[in-house]
Amino acid sequence: MSEEMMQTSPFECPAWFDGKKINETVFCEEFLRDYPMVTVNDAFFTVNGRVHDENRLKKVIYDRIKYYVTSGVAKKVTNLLDVMRMECCTAKLSLYQDRIHVANGTYYLNGTFSPEKDFCRNRLPVAYNPDAPQPVTWLHFLSQLLEPEDILTLQEFMGYCFIPSTKGQKMLLLIGKGGEGKSRIGIVLRALLGSNMNTGSIAKVETSPFARADLEHELVMLDDDMKLEALPQTNNIKAIITAELPMDLEKKGQQSYQGDLYVRFIGLGNGVLQSLYDRSVGFFRRQIILSTKEKDPNRKDDPY
């Protein structure tokens, strides 16, 4: 949400206020003209991707109506947000696998770039720079962490995570003994993906009925400290990794619904992912396992 949206001033009686009450439909139509949005499965999206913090939307609405509503303000703000959710509802927001939505426009996988922005589910917080210098520090770090062929695999998988696709049908596991610096991968991914990445537990995906809904509209789910306990089942993980059709999602206290999942799993830990009962090829073929190098005893870590 831009700072512009956080400012409003009462100069004259707006069209949506008749002196006694607010016309909710007219208010929402005006609001959406100023700040275009659409909703998919009750989630708001702008040209900058998903609106993760609806409290900021409520603050903008509050700033507009606070001069005209003197009681029950919080309830009125919530009601207006719900009406707006219906007003801009769309059946589907297309997922494009031939482009990456970046902060300064759209980068197409054929190598072209456009500064134009369209409504999208995910926009990365980083800008495309065709003249960016070689990431020397990053490459040096990777050379200490992984073998050359594994570096290529890691970078290819990270690129795969930038588009909403599950065609790779793989998850990535980075395994080490500890202290190698593999958790830095998560820090870099957070900088690249921003709020389009969810951090949590892969095991929770199998044990919580609400975990799948938390992954809707996310590009990556990172588990930076995988549990060594074997998974009681693997159905959900396998289904999500290869998902091509809408899946049944459930939020607490709400009726389940069909939603698209294109999240990719990345796990960091001291051991591989295990299952109590699943010994099938289907479980293990979905995993790309990279083992880190032994930590150089002469390496001096930068605490900053």
Predicted segments with their positions:
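P-loop NTPase catalytic core of nucleic-acid-dependent motor ATPases
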Residues: 2-5, 32-50, 55-56, 100-219, ...
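Conserved nucleotide-binding/hydrolysis micro-motifs of P-loop NTPases
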Residues: 227-228, 270-275, 293-298
